[in-house]
């Protein structure tokens, strides 16, 4: 008689129980990931919305209906933007090993950047941060075939990372051409990150020791990495303690506007 057939039923049950327990633990871990990420994605727009609505109320009480209407418009844009972000987030979590599906459109990249920076101006100001957009490369053509939601989330998370963790007073966004590609760069004049900590800042739930304004969830740069990988791009960090950070996203040129996995 083989060892398999002679094994006690209790041993089989224990093995099945262990397998089921491992499965349940994976499901719980995935659920916790989803909850943490959802909290991360909801916290940012709620803060931005509260700023816009508070200003809308103040201006309306002062009789400035035009300015109040503009504040409400910005609040509506914030809601739309973060609804798209949550959709992207759910796809990343549902298929952790898969590449995010891009839906490319031909968009005016500087215009997208300017709109996002404008929507974050109040939050930056409330933190004492000045933002600047630089696009002085004469070879940089504004129109690019890319996924606008993914690109917006990449920049949004890089900016929010600078707002929350760097202790910066100035953040600069640069657009430029590269060989067969184009680059999006976010530079701050904050506290910087030690070389030994730089690789880990891109990992899920990692919060670098340099963070000076709250622990955060450690998800923003992980989301950036996943989306940049989907674009067949790369992200690099140049920093040292006391010198600030320069995050550079390099995205290959793409001529097609198809869905891409």
Regions found by a protein language model. Give the residues of each.
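Short alpha-helical segment of the dimerization/phosphotransfer core of two-component systems
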Residues: 75-82
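Short helix-loop "hinge" at the ATP-lid/N-box region of the Bergerat-fold HATPase_c
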Residues: 162-163
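Short conserved segment of the HATPase_c
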Residues: 193-205
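Glycine-rich ATP-lid/hinge loop adjacent to the conserved G-boxes
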Residues: 206-216
